[in-house]
Amino acid sequence: MDYDVLYLCAKSKENLSKYRRYIKPHVVMKETNTILDGMDKYYKTFPSVTEFAWDSFTAFLIADQSKRLTDDSIVKLRMMLTKARAFVPHHAHEEVIKTLIELDYLAQIMEECEKVKEGSSDLEHVHILATN
């Protein structure tokens, strides 16, 4: 699932902006979150970039993260970047993305239900989330 997410977000800056909020840290590996955060920083650092290039992004991310990560973590990150660059989406790719979005909505609904239980919200908010 991690490579599906990276593939989708690497397609365009718009895709990253559109889908990043649905990708929760507990759903994907730590390296995936590092890469996604790096993509966001990459686009902010180079606003004129319109087409994502794995090679230049990899160099940017490794340079940026080398100050923060251990050697072992850098090796894991490099492996993840290499696999992400070579990833070819499979027939279930779209389903993976739908599942991520569904998981996010379910989490939001559960949080709102907790608020209803505590008395700080009402069922109208749950209904709005469930029907959007």
Locate each region found by the language model:
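Noncatalytic partner-interaction/assembly domains of nucleic-acid and motor enzyme complexes
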Residues: M1-L103
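Interdomain "pre-motor" coupling segment immediately N-terminal to P-loop NTPase/helicase cores
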Residues: T82-N132
